[in-house]
Amino acid sequence: MKFEEFLIGKYVNLVLLDEEVAKNTDWYTWFNFSENTKILDVGKFPHTLKKQLDYIKNELATKKEILSFEEVDRKIQLGVVEKVTNTLVGMVSAYNINYISRTCYVSVITDLRKKNFNRLKVFKECQDMLLDHLFFTLNLRKIYTGATDKKLSDFTIKIWGFKREAIFEKHAYIDGKYEDAFVLGLFKEDWQRFKKI
């Protein structure tokens, strides 16, 4: 499939999403694989192509909105395409964008069923690209993310320099028990310093 590139990296490209991507990839099926959604709020009920198309139409910023660099009130979500195989392997998102306080939340997911790429390189590069775009192109000053897994929280702190700002005790219901949720924050100046290390 020919993807419409938005941000170009060494190992991955971040691409614009539309109905064609949903119809011509296995994206919507990711949410039916329990390992992909184990620590997410989605995936508790079967997912269909129709639900994915509705999601694109109703929840995501359009290509035109993203390319205009104007304020958007919907989620900015980009596909992660592994360059060697030209395969859609993940998604990055920026949401709850506050243009007054200059903050937002980010998330990333990769399809754990796909094994023919270096997941760590892809995971690192796509998040780096998103952070750079949000801080240096959209001029945001602080970015938040979250995790319901302490190991993932610690990994995010180590790899990107986020700081743990809050712990919501027994917040998320996962595998039959309530787990803590960790809220992490990263200031633009801390990201600039962290990248130089």
Where are these regions (language model features)?
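Active-site-proximal loop/turn and secondary-structure-junction residues that shape catalytic pockets
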Residues: 110, 149-151
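GNAT-family acyltransferases
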Residues: 1-115, 171, 177-197
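Amphipathic alpha-helical recognition patches that constitute DNA-binding helices
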Residues: 105, 142, 152, 159
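Conserved catalytic-core motifs of GNAT/GCN5-like acyltransferases
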Residues: 144-147, 163-179
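Conserved acetyl-CoA-binding loop-helix of GNAT-fold acetyltransferases
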Residues: 117-133, 155, 159
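Short alpha-helical
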Residues: 22, 151-152
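Conserved GNAT acetyl-CoA-binding A-motif
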Residues: 136-146
